Design a protein with these regions (language model features):
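Periplasmic/extracellular loop-to-transmembrane helix junction in inner-membrane transport proteins
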Residues: 33, 37-45, 75-109, 114, ...
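Hydrophobic alpha-helical transmembrane signal-anchor segments
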Residues: 41-72
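Surface-exposed loop/turn positions within WD40 beta-propeller blades
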Residues: 104, 113, 150, 158-159, ...
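WD40-repeat beta-propellers
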Residues: 116-121, 162-167, 226-231, 284-289, ...
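Transmembrane-helix boundary motif in ABC transporter permease subunits
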Residues: 486-506
Length: 506
């Protein structure tokens, strides 16, 4: 029967049959709307939270990068030098040595008349004038400095004698304002009596090196005879109760009449193993001090030419520690030399050079706490160098009239220059990180005591004489190696975990 002919009730039932499959929620329309709003809010909150979290991570990484950039960039910054004061000491004697006190409050100038003048570093006001105890009628013919740290020096006399003295400061603090008060002094740790190195012959050159209570002197007389002397302090058991002294010196001498020298300069290394004899043309000959006192006929064991071409040395000085020898010449070049050992063969090798200018180098002054030094040339151009980093931190003309001498403070924060006219100029120095350079971080560096350049990381040691080694290559290689071995274990675990999770979720 056609659907059109069905009764109305039956037709209504047929039309209503599909509606029986629709599931009607038991919740009211208000609760459904509330649930939808809550779901929408949760989705929105999660979306914002994830976005904020991701952006925060990126911002945090950028801030870390900015902080590291802020901390690292100053490591490569150069030094700054600013004039602090200038004054005239009114001293006509030639300068043998300039030195600055530990905290840059006072300075000392030793003249060729044997008088040490101590003065305020900022004002130039005289604090004390002390004459070294030189025998009556004797004149100074040569000078040698042990090291800037010890303050010990030797004066060679025209009588063939040598006086060993030390400049120092006694420190006390005022009771009212706790102000630091310095009292300069010249003392004689190895006795006031001069040491005889030649008989009635002026000492043309002299070298001094000390270690604790032991001292070694080397000198050449005008005739060319080389003399060696060792002195060791012998303290008696009752020295603590003897206010008058109680100390004696055991002295050992050796006159090497078979070695006739000319006007060579003498230097003793920091370990007192070698005597460097350097002539005016830069030829260095080395005598072993371990056998010089006992061998019947000691001879020079090593030799090397310290200059290139027709250059002649103008100033020579040991770097901090007494291992490296700095040589400045009349062509403006500065070179670093030290002894190396390969297969039981010892050689004096040129490690690196610093070409500052074509003007002759006048003076070299090593720092007391870092492997750095200061140079000044004949035109008054001052440069700050670091040997390990092979870096020139500063260069500038600070003495228009030329320079006679210069000194850098123990902390490296002050520079004192005596000009060609005898005026003193004090300069404030800020040179925080001279030992950092791109080559020191990523290239092979030839460190003191090593036979060849190498990648080494060793940032500190027990003494200031240590040469810091900042190569990042060992650290980077170690980090990458550790990451590689970690990935060998982490990668299989991650892959297997992903597979397991995928099957579990399925």
């Amino acid at each position: 029967m056609p659907a059109d002919n069905l009764p109305e009730a039956q037709s209504r039932l047929i039309d209503d049959e599909p509606s029986q499959s629709v599931k009607v929620s038991v919740l009211s329309s208000e609760k459904l709307a509330s649930r939808r709003r809550w779901r929408h809010l949760s989705d929105k909150t999660a979306k914002v939270s994830i976005a904020v979290g991701g952006i925060s991570v990126i911002v945090a990484i950028l801030l870390i990068f900015a902080y590291l950039f802020y901390e690292v960039v100053p490591l490569f910054a150069g030094a700054t030098v600013e004039e602090a004061a200038s004054y005239d000491l009114q001293d006509s004697s030639a300068s043998l040595h300039l030195a600055i006190e530990e905290q840059s409050e006072m300075a000392m100038r030793l003249g060729d008349d044997g008088v040490a003048r101590f003065f305020d570093l900022e004002s130039g006001e005289n604090a004390a004038t002390i004459a070294v105890k030189v025998p009556s009628g004797a004149t100074i013919t040569s000078f040698a400095l042990d090291s800037e740290q010890s303050g010990l020096f030797a004066l060679g006399l025209n009588t063939g004698e040598a006086v060993v003295a030390r400049y120092a400061y006694d420190t006390r603090f005022a009771q009212l304002d706790n102000r630091r008060i310095l009292t300069p002094k010249i003392d004689y740790p190895f006795g006031e009596i001069p040491y005889t190195l030649a008989v009635d012959k002026p000492l043309a050159s002299i070298a001094l090196r000390t270690s604790g209570e032991n001292m070694m002197l080397a000198a050449t007389a005008r005739g060319g005879e080389l003399s060696l002397l060792k002195a060791s302090k012998q303290t008696s058991l009752f020295a603590a109760f003897d206010l008058g002294g109680g100390a004696e010196f055991e002295i050992e001498e050796r006159r090497l009449s078979g070695m006739t020298l000319g006007g060579e300069q003498l230097f003793i290394d920091g370990d007192r193993f070698w005597l460097f004899v350097i002539d005016d043309e830069g030829l260095a000959r080395l005598l072993s001090l371990r056998t010089a006192f006992t061998a019947p006929n000691p001879q020079f064991e090593l030799q090397a030419l310290l200059t290139e071409g027709r250059a002649n040395p103008t100033d020579i000085s040991f770097l901090l520690g007494g291992i490296s020898l700095l040589v400045g010449d009349d062509q403006g070049a500065i070179s670093q030399w030290f002894l190396t050992k390969r297969d039981d063969t010892v050689a004096l090798e040129k490690i690196r050079s610093f070409q500052d200018s074509a003007t002759p180098v006048v003076s070299l002054s090593p720092e007391q706490r870092r492997k750095s030094f200061v140079s000044v040339d004949a035109q008054g151009v001052v440069s700050l160098f670091n040997t390990t980093a092979r870096r020139q931190a500063f260069t500038g003309q600070l003495a228009a009239d030329g320079a006679r001498a210069l000194a850098i403070s123990p902390r490296g924060d002050a520079l004192l220059i005596e000009s060609g006219r005898g005026q003193m100029a004090l300069w404030a120095v800020e040179n925080k990180h001279p030992e950092v350079s791109w080559s020191a971080l990523w290239s092979r560096v030839w460190y003191e005591g090593y036979s060849e350049p190498d990648f080494i990381w060793q940032s500190s040691a027990a003494t200031n004489e240590f040469e810091p080694k900042y190569s990042l290559v060992p650290l980077s290689f170690g980090t990458l190696k550790a990451a590689f071995y970690a990935m060998l274990l982490a990668a299989p675990l991650a892959i297997c975990g992903a597979i397991f999770t995928g099957y579990f979720m399925a």
